[in-house]
């Protein structure tokens, strides 16, 4: 698909499908990092995570699951600023954590209010990575806690 068949205004997978008049399961889109075609499950996952489409030379790109996790981990190592509890995050941003868009640092899904409450109740810290606040969604939280119990490295 190129800019000739649909405009480059689409920012999400859903907008891309609407503008190009195709259905989500039939969308074929490449990974911006590894250049492989995303599987249908990866396209759905990308859409569910509310991630943005990237345009290069008139073509839209997304990111496959493996590249999302890999580049997320690289970003943690290279751009970790510091960790802080919810009250510090709110003090610094002058907003409640519920008003902030905080994504999971592993899968990049926006955290729901329940997931933000989980951080507060469990006294877990949020992480400032590349000047953006991140935390863990419930799915990634569970896998990280299991790893910690087995004395493995942190997620």
From Swiss-Prot:
Main localization (coarse): host cell
A single Gene Ontology MF term assigned here is: zinc ion binding
**Stored InterPro entries:** E6, E6_sf
User: Where are the unnamed Zn fingers located?
Assistant: 31-67, 104-140
Q: Where in the cell is it found?
A: Host cytoplasm; Host nucleus
Q: Which UniProt keywords apply?
A: Activator, DNA-binding, Early protein, Host cytoplasm, Host nucleus, Host-virus interaction, Inhibition of host innate immune response by virus, Metal-binding, Modulation of host cell apoptosis by virus, Transcription, Transcription regulation, Viral immunoevasion, Zinc, Zinc-finger
Instruction: Name a Pfam family for this protein.
Output: E6
Any one Gene Ontology BP term: symbiont-mediated suppression of host innate immune response
Q: What is any one of the record's Gene Ontology cellular component terms?
A: host cell cytoplasm
What does the record's miscellaneous section state? Belongs to the low risk human alphapapillomavirus family. The cancer-causing human papillomavirus E6 protein has a unique carboxy terminal PDZ domain containing substrate but low risk E6s do not possess this domain.
Q: How does it assemble?
A: Forms homodimers. Interacts with ubiquitin-protein ligase UBE3A/E6-AP; this interaction stimulates UBE3A ubiquitin activity. Interacts with host TP53 and EP300; this interaction inhibits TP53 activity.
Q: What family is this? A: Belongs to the papillomaviridae E6 protein family.
Function of the molecule = This protein may be involved in the oncogenic potential of this virus (cervical neoplasia-associated virus).
Q: Tell me what this protein is called.
A: Protein E6
Q: Which organism is it from?
A: Human papillomavirus 43
